[in-house]
Structures are given as C-alpha cells and as structure tokens.
C-alpha cells in the first residue's frame, strides 16, 4: 500500500491519543505485511511458498481470508491473482506515476486467458498455525488492503471522539455526523484532470472508495495500459470508464466493489450496481458522470457537465 493514512477526531475524548497511536500501528502493520513491493513481506513469502503452507502474521492472514470472501461475493470479478499480469506490464516494482510519463517494454511471463472465463480461487487456511496456502499463482492485496486497513483503524478509533474520519489513499471511513453536524463532506476527484471535483458526497457512518486510472496509467510497447486487471482476460480492463466511486457501510467492500464495477465496464455497470443495491458513481471516457439509484441520497452536489 503506497499510501499515507490520516485521522481526524472531532471532539476527542481521554482515550483519543492512545487510540490514534494504536490505529497508526495497525496501519503500519498491514502495510508492512501485505505489500507486494517488499520481497521480505509476509505476503511475498506466502507467494513464494505457493501451494505450500506459509506462516503469516494475523493481519496478513485476515487480509487473505477477506480477499477470498470478496472473490466469492463478487463472483470472481475481484481476484487478487493479478501480480503476474502487472509484472508482465512492467509494474513489478513501484513506479513514479505522479511525477512523470512512463513508457516501458513488456516483461515475459504474463499468461493469456480465454475471455469470459472466471477461474475459481481456493487458498488454504490453517487457523491454529496462522498459516496460508495461496496456490500456484501469486496474489496482490492492493485491491483490498487499503480498505481493510481503513476498516481496522476505524474500528480502533470509533470511540475516540464524537466523529471520526479515516482516509488512506482516497479510501475513506466517515463515522458520526462530522464537525458541522450534517455529515462529512467528501469530494470525488475528476479522473479527467484538474482540481475541481465531479461530485461532493455527504456521508454519516459510511465508507467511500474510488477506483481510477487517472494516476496509475502508463505505456507498454506503445500501448496505454493501467493497473485494474480484468480476471477474465488478465489484461487491463477495457471498460470505457475513467473512474468508479462506491459508497458502502464497509471500506473494504467499497474498494472491492469500485474495482469490480470498473471491470464490468460502462455497458454493464448500471445493471450490476442496481441489482446489488450498490451506491455507485462513475465517469466514462467522455467525461460523463452517472449515478446508480442507491447513490442519489449521498450526493450533495454534482457537476452537470465535465
């Protein structure tokens, strides 16, 4: 998780300092054990073990278990087995997305896939030993790790004050009614560029996450690619979308569903979000902003034309 975490505690109580310290420690533990960018991390040690058992700390064990739950909940649209695809596109290590245009040559090792096929994922868990068996393909927890860290930090901070906000790399959990008593006001960044948001959300006891290709896009062998991998093709999702924002009662599932809806793309996102009752806002490649039915209650303001 290449993100910093920020906490806001409105009207803190006597427990606040201790709870903030605890929440910071939780975030750091998740970031340390669940990163794919450190070969010595618990996640990468589990990836190296493959079909063999690997003992991991509790936060990594719980994150992999949560990833399996999300994989099942989304019927395979969320799939952490994206590491080989990202590595084959040159994203095996951190890249300076925010400071320069990136052009790379593809690496060997990416696997092709028949379009439309969802592959079952069946990792193993040994609770007594805190051990996991991820399987024959390495996994990346980037699609759920921030959301889980925000969830666990928010749970630690919940009783630290009247209202709490936890934010990590755009994943947000808003607890309570906020400083003004009418909800936390959260802006949704435009994926088309510029500093003006496409919407402002009013949230109370809700999480929000956005999946966007505004930053993590680069060129490989002359082709524009991005980091959101479609598990049906093992290639960057061809979705005709720029970003998807989801409001949910849980930050991990806000993150999971924002990516899953991005993957199904412009042609299917409205049906899936409405069928699942998901509060979603999406911006397509032409800059059009669209809301699902369930999102309307959270929108305090939205742009009329991007």
Regions found by a protein language model. Give the residues of each.
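Mature catalytic core of soluble alpha/beta enzymes
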Residues: 1-306
